[in-house]
Amino acid sequence: MAASSAIGSSPAAPNIAWNETQRRFETEDKKAYVEYVLRQDGKVMDIVHTFVPSSKRGLGLASHLCVAAFNHAKSHSLSVITSCSYVSDTFLPRNPSWNSLLYSEEPRSNI
């Protein structure tokens, strides 16, 4: 069953939908997206690919897609692995507040 729910709906932010069936977050036109794989029995979201077509680059879409993915991980108590180089090399250095969700083999405290 495909689940699609709007993540961002403010005028400044594009509408990003969670496509559960295809395991990705995507723009309304489905042309820009972040793909993920669930690991560790569904407890870890591995973000494996970010794509924005050349005609839409420079608009901040990749960042909006990543925020949607990290918000989803946070609200579902998932840790995140960043196999995608955009996420690890560009998004996280610019948005270090998300580092707390990164997967670690050490148990996390719930404090």
How should each PLM-predicted stretch be described?
Residues 1-55, 71-82, 92-93, 106-111:
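Non-catalytic substrate-recognition and accessory regions of acyl/acetyltransferase enzymes
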Residues 86, 104:
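Residue-level "edge-of-site" marker
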Residues 58-70:
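Conserved acetyl-CoA-binding loop-helix of GNAT-fold acetyltransferases
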Residues 88-90:
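Short secondary-structure capping/turn micro-motifs that flank functional sites
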Residues 97-101:
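Short, hinge-like loop/turn segments at secondary-structure boundaries
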Residues 66, 80-85:
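Catalytic nucleophile loop
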